[in-house]
Regions:
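TRNA-recognition modules of translation machinery and tRNA-sensing kinases, especially anticodon-binding
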Residues: 1-155
Length: 155
């Protein structure tokens, strides 16, 4: 008889969350149905931004949305818990986009969002955390590089 095993996504999340918690991040979670304020306004997404359109976002009859990302959870957790720096949060979760599905797009996907606020943190810290994370996932011999780029579709 063959023993069962964990789903690949569960395995990925366990490795990911362990990596970040070992580095002082706390895991935060939030609802999959959000207010427009937490999903867009709190993140300074303009009212006329294409991501707010019905062809990109699932809207409920009550004016709420299925979250399009986990980033708005950062704001909610910090606000509701009156958190102050220093803080490190990691937010995993399922996200939804009202898109046509193809080989590179799905209406549902998982995202891991992180935020770290402290004195003297800089891009070197971010790059170090992400480099270590990629090595945790793909092996210590992985070579990474940072390639700054402008993505106007997310501006």
């Amino acid at each position: 008889m063959t023993n069962g095993h964990l789903h690949p996504l569960t395995q990925f999340l366990r490795v990911s969350l362990q990596y970040f918690t070992e580095r002082g991040f706390e895991i935060a979670e939030g609802p999959e149905i959000k207010t427009e304020w937490y999903n867009f306004d709190a993140l300074n997404t303009p009212a006329d931004h294409p991501s707010r359109d019905v062809q990109d976002t699932f809207w409920t009859k009550g004016g709420k949305v299925l979250r399009t990302h986990t980033t708005g959870t950062d704001i909610r957790v910090i606000k509701e818990n009156k958190l102050t720096p220093p803080l490190k949060l990691i937010i995993p979760g399922r996200c939804f986009r009202n898109e046509a599905t193809d080989s590179t797009h799905e209406h549902t996907f998982y995202q891991i969002d992180g935020i770290a606020i402290d004195k003297d943190l800089n891009m070197g810290h971010l790059i170090g955390i992400l480099d270590g994370y990629m090595k945790e996932l793909f092996g210590k011999d992985l070579e990474t590089r940072v390639r700054p780029h402008l993505y106007p579709f997310v501006e």
